[in-house]
Structure formats: structure tokens, C-alpha cells
């Protein structure tokens, strides 16, 4: 039996989500031939323990270097100071990096992996190369374009890309060109293009609606149109996103615009319905009284509810997450309004805007205007989305499993 090590970077949920889609494909096709180990830290480590309660001995906790949260994404100032100084309850980053590389190296020595799969963990690429272990790196960025305000991050981008280069195979979790959402985040050098494979998006496949309709689904099924406003990211990012949304809703142009806000938080106290009468209702009460609503707030949507929302909404407002963009643009053929947090998001939304699949909005005023533009030119967006959706490749996990099998055989 072959042993595979999966190293999951703990910043955000995207790396974890992608790896779990891949794990399912591995278990469906190779479970009798491979033994999976996973390594991460923090919240993602806890999620791995919950996901694999019978295999806790194969889940390894190694603290990986991550930025410090700021008001909107990572704090550049605090993260820079943290390189040599303790900051926000964290030890100096230099000591974290040293311990992280040492512990991952020891894990390699102890487990004798036949293959490693790294999603976001570039340090593991370097360790694998030094130990002559075959290595796959899964990504949607290599040398992303930096906007003028972030030029000082360029040395870090070069450092990360040089470690990505050390992988045996670089897997891009996106459709091949010219339908690559993350195109502006790649910019591969000629010397490594031969090891790059565009495998397709790591989709979880179609959602089977096996449960009775929830109150949320009942509330949205017979309305004329509404927007799906997603709140994702770390705590501080969620807070500022919600504040921006509220400011947008208070503008005169938005007084009649229906919206469903998903808070991505398992806090049922967030669940409420705002009627056009200005009163607030519970979900059950709103359904029973057939309330004509203007806003629905949901703490957490089930997979079935999310699928229903995406099927019925007219557009989605998101931060530019690669996974979410693929699901909405490709899977559901719905236009997006993108409000970016990172340059990675800005690049992906800009790519979308350049192809008339959505709109980039960096201010509240632009967000409000974007809603109007989508309503006024909806048919044009639908035509472009129809072509993009036809070429949306969802075979990422299946194609990656084929590559894994070939690398293990060779």
C-alpha cells in the first residue's frame, strides 16, 4: 500500500475544501491502494480531526506560518513586525518557520511518503525535493499581478513562486485557457510550463435535493428576482464586508432590491427576515404569513439551500474566492459583482469583468452601480456566461487522481 501525505495550508478554508474534494475522489477510486495522511494547524487541523475521527493517528498538527489578521484581510504591518518580534500572541515568525520546516522534515523521515500533495504549503515542496519524494502542488496562483499599492510584496511573490517551482507536478485547479479564471494570477515562467497541468475545477458535483424544502427555500422560490450577497473570510473581513453591504442597502437605488445575505456562521441568531413593511420576522413566521420580504439574513446555508439560492438568484456578490467564482460563473452561469479583499481576488474579478461575466467593485458606490448595470444589461451577461459555462471543466479531482496513479506507478 502506498502512503500519501497531504499538506493543507491553514489560511482560509479554500485549501481545505479543495483537498477534501480530492480526498473523496481518492477514496472512491484508490482507497484500497493508498493510505492518506494530512497535516495542517489551527482551525483546519480541528476540521481534519472531525472529518477523519477513525484515523486521528494520520492527522498531524504542525504550526504553519500564516499572516496576522487585519481589518481587511492580513495586516501587512503586524505580519512584518512579527517576523522578528512576538505579535498578537504569536511567537516571532522566524522561529515558527524554523520549527515548521524541522517538524515537517521529521514527518517525512518517519512516514516515508511515496508521494505528497501540497495545497498552499510551499515549504513542503522544498522538503520533498531535498528528500527526492514525488510532489504535487495544487494551486490557482504562481506570480499574481500586484497592483500599485502592493508593489512591496513582490519579493515575497518571487520567493513563493520559486518554492512552487520545486514541485514535481503543478496542478492548476481551473479550466484550461482561454477559460482560466485565475489566469492573471499565474504568469508561469517558460522553464516550468512542461510540469503544469490544467486539470479543471475541484467541484463537489451536483447536489441531490433529498430533503424537504426549508423555510429559506420556500421564501425565495416564488419571488421575481433577488441578489445573493455572500460574506466569507476571517472575522475582521466578515465584519467590514457586512458594514459595506449595509451602507449599500441604505442607498436610495437599493431600497427595492431584494437580497439574501449568507453570513457563513453557524449562529442561528443571525437568521431573520426583513419585510417590506419594515418589520422583522423569523423564517417560519415569514413563511406562514407569506411576508413580502426585502432582505433575508441566514447564518449558515446547507448545501441544498445554497444550491437552491444559486439556482434562483439573479446575481451573486462575492469577494473573489476562486472556488466560489467557479461554482457561480461556470456551474450556475450567473453574473457576479466582486468586492475583492486580496490582489488575488482583484485579478480574478478583473478577468471576469474583461470577459463581461461580472463587475469589479472596490467602493460602495461602484457596488450599487454594478447592481443597476447587471439588471440593465442582463441578456448580454447571460450570452457570455452561456459560452463560459459550456467550457467550464469540473473534472479537477478525477484528472488529478489519474496523475496521482501515474506518478505512483512510475
What does each of the following model-derived ranges do?
Residues 8-20, 236-239:
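A short, glycine/small-residue-rich beta-strand->loop->alpha-helix junction that serves as a flexible
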Residues 393-410:
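C-terminal alpha-helical cap of glycosyltransferases
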Residues 116-119, 303-348:
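A donor-sugar binding/catalytic signature common to diverse glycosyltransferases
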Residues 204-315, 346:
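Donor-nucleotide binding loops and adjacent catalytic segments primarily
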Residues 34-95:
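Conserved nucleotide-sugar phosphate-binding/catalytic loop shared by glycosyltransferases and other
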Amino acid at each position: 500500500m502506498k502512503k500519501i501525505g497531504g499538506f493543507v495550508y491553514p489560511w482560509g478554508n479554500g485549501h481545505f475544501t479543495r483537498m477534501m474534494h480530492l480526498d473523496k475522489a481518492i477514496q472512491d477510486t484508490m482507497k484500497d491502494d493508498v493510505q492518506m495522511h494530512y497535516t495542517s494547524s489551527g482551525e483546519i487541523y480541528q476540521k481534519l480531526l472531525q472529518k477523519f475521527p477513525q484515523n486521528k493517528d494520520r492527522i498531524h498538527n504542525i504550526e504553519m506560518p500564516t499572516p496576522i489578521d487585519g481589518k481587511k484581510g492580513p495586516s501587512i504591518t503586524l505580519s512584518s513586525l512579527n517576523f522578528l518580534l512576538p505579535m498578537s500572541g504569536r511567537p516571532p515568525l522566524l522561529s515558527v518557520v524554523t520549527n515548521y520546516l524541522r517538524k515537517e522534515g521529521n514527518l517525512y523521515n518517519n512516514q516515508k511518503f511515496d508521494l505528497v500533495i501540497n495545497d498552499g504549503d510551499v515549504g513542503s515542496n522544498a522538503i520533498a525535493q531535498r528528500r527526492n519524494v514525488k510532489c504535487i502542488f495544487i494551486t490557482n496562483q504562481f506570480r499574481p499581478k500586484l497592483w500599485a499599492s502592493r508593489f512591496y510584496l513582490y519579493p515575497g511573490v518571487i520567493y513563493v513562486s520559486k518554492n512552487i517551482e520545486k514541485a514535481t507536478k503543478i496542478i492548476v485547479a481551473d479550466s484550461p485557457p482561454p477559460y482560466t479564471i485565475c489566469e492573471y494570477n499565474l504568469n508561469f515562467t517558460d522553464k516550468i510550463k512542461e510540469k503544469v497541468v490544467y486539470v479543471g475545477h475541484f467541484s463537489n458535483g451536483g447536489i441531490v435535493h433529498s430533503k424537504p424544502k426549508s423555510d429559506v427555500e420556500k421564501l425565495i422560490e416564488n419571488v421575481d428576482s433577488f441578489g445573493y450577497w455572500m460574506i466569507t473570510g476571517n472575522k475582521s473581513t466578515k465584519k467590514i464586508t457586512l458594514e459595506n453591504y449595509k451602507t449599500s442597502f441604505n442607498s436610495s437605488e437599493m431600497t427595492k432590491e431584494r437580497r439574501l445575505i449568507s453570513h457563513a456562521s453557524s449562529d442561528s441568531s443571525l437568521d431573520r427576515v426583513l419585510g417590506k413593511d419594515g418589520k422583522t420576522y423569523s423564517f417560519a413566521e415569514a413563511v406562514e404569513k407569506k411576508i413580502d420580504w426585502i432582505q433575508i439574513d441566514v447564518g449558515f446555508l446547507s448545501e441544498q439551500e445554497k444550491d437552491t439560492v444559486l439556482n434562483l438568484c439573479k446575481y451573486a456578490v462575492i469577494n473573489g474566492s476562486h472556488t466560489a467564482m467557479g461554482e457561480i460563473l461556470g456551474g450556475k452561469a450567473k453574473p457576479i459583482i466582486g468586492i475583492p479583499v486580496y490582489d488575488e481576488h482583484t485579478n480574478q474579478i478583473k478577468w471576469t469583468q474583461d470577459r463581461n461575466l461580472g463587475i469589479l467593485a472596490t467602493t460602495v458606490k461602484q457596488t450599487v452601480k454594478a447592481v443597476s448595470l447587471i439588471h440593465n444589461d442582463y441578456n448580454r451577461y447571460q450570452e457570455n456566461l452561456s459560452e463560459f459555462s459550456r467550457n467550464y471543466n469540473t473534472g479537477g479531482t478525477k484528472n488529478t487522481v489519474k496523475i496521482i496513479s501515474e506518478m505512483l506507478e512510475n
